């Protein structure tokens, strides 16, 4: 299965295993991390970025792949669709059938709204399904949302929007409770206590997992809840443009049935964009574990109507994935393997970094090892 070159490396890794057992690589200083990121992290490659020429983020920079999408013209011509002919009329239109979209639809339905999900693939075909390691929430006695906030704020180099990060950490325990009550089978002790583990850059064990298929289990539960509630789901139908009313408020979307090629009109009092990110656009040519649907569709829809993008100049490069064999190139290797003891080693069998550094530092360390150090 392995190439001769790989087998040589495997032998070196095996030969150094005994010396690594029980050792803990030192953590980098803040200065070392900053220098490492500047030299090796993809977000610092000036040649990979272009200036945005139009829209609310005009004058700012983003990865070239995203900028080209932001500069693109709509595929919709006025003679393609009759806006007076309404095909769907609902209170809430949710665009996107992943974890966020399903959750939004469930909550809207619980509040009594007439809600519909539209997704360009199938419900559940999303990055939520691809997640393996777990979801973090400070719900143990030795932890708190304040500590979670500090870990996350520092791990993000103090660039996070405080109000958004506060909402994340304060509501995370309730989100875990909600998912648990819906039926998500989190890992638990015999007495029912949830098992938690460390994640990269965390000072407390707050990672809640479902074995190594956390996202699939969460999506299974959400999908079942959507079906059990009878929430309509229009699959293989993409939103190609948002519609505004005479008050300039979003009032629905033009949809494209990807099987028939027909354009459809959905009218809604509220539109929720839950289409995920841009990870499948292969920024800077990197392989990706992102789902095929993560192609920035919703970002472009919102941007064309004046919604500014946040953090458009950065993207998370997950440190660990499959490089061989080619059939699963780019598949995710979850952070959880490092949280329970796995080390990152180079081709010489040397542990070159602490296994629980933050993801940006870990990714930059791996890139340095493979390029500058040639290991």
What are these regions (language model features)?
Residues 109-132, 141:
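Glycine-rich FAD pyrophosphate-binding loop
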Residues 114-121, 278-287, 297-299, 303-321:
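Glycine-rich phosphate/pyrophosphate-binding loops
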Residues 137-168:
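Glycine-rich active-site loop/strand segments that organize a redox cofactor
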Residues 1-91:
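Extreme N-terminal leader/targeting segments of oxidoreductases
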Residues 98-100, 122, 213, 278:
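Residue-level detector of alpha-helix initiation sites
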Residues 44-63, 69, 181-262, 267, ...:
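Conserved redox-cofactor binding core of oxidoreductases
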Residues 92-117:
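N-terminal Rossmann-like FAD-binding beta1-loop-alpha1 element of flavoenzymes
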Residues 1-21, 301, 307-375:
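An anion/pyrophosphate-binding glycine-rich loop and adjacent beta-alpha core
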């Amino acid at each position: 299965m392995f190439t001769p070159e790989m087998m040589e490396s495997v032998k070196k890794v095996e030969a150094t295993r005994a010396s690594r057992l029980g050792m803990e690589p030192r953590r980098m200083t803040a200065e070392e991390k900053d220098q490492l990121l500047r030299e090796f992290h993809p977000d610092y490659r000036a040649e990979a970025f272009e200036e945005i020429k139009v829209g609310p983020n005009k004058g700012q920079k983003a990865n070239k792949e995203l900028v080209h999408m932001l500069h693109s013209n709509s595929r919709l011509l006025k003679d393609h669709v009759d806006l007076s002919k309404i095909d769907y009329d609902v209170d809430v239109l949710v665009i996107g059938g992943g974890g966020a979209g399903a959750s939004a639809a469930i909550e809207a339905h619980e509040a009594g709204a007439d809600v519909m999900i539209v997704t360009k693939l199938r419900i559940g075909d999303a990055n939520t399904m691809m997640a393996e390691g777990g979801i973090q929430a400070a719900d143990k006695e030795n932890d708190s949302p304040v500590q979670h906030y500090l870990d996350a704020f520092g791990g993000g180099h103090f660039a996070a929007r405080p109000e958004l990060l506060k909402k994340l950490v304060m509501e995370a325990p309730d989100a875990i409770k909600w998912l648990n009550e819906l039926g998500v089978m989190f890992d638990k002790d015999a007495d029912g206590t949830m098992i938690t583990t460390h994640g990269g850059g965390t000072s407390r064990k707050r990672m809640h997992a479902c074995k190594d298929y956390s996202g699939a289990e969460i999506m299974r539960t959400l999908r079942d809840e959507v079906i059990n509630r009878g929430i309509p789901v229009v699959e293989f139908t993409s939103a190609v443009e948002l519609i505004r009313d005479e008050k300039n408020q979003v009032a629905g979307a033009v949809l494209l049935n990807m099987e028939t090629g027909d354009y459809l009109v959905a009218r809604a009092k509220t539109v929720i964009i839950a289409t995920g990110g841009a990870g499948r656009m292969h920024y800077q040519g990197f392989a990706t574990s992102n789902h095929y649907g993560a192609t920035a569709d919703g970002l472009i829809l919102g941007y064309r109507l004046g919604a500014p993008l946040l953090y458009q100049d950065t993207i998370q490069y997950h440190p660990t994935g499959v490089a061989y064999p080619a059939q699963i190139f780019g598949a995710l290797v979850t952070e959880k393997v490092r949280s329970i003891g796995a080390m990152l080693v180079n081709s010489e069998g040397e542990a070159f970094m602490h296994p629980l550094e933050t993801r940006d530092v870990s990714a930059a360390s791996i890139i340095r090892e493979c390029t500058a150090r040639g290991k």
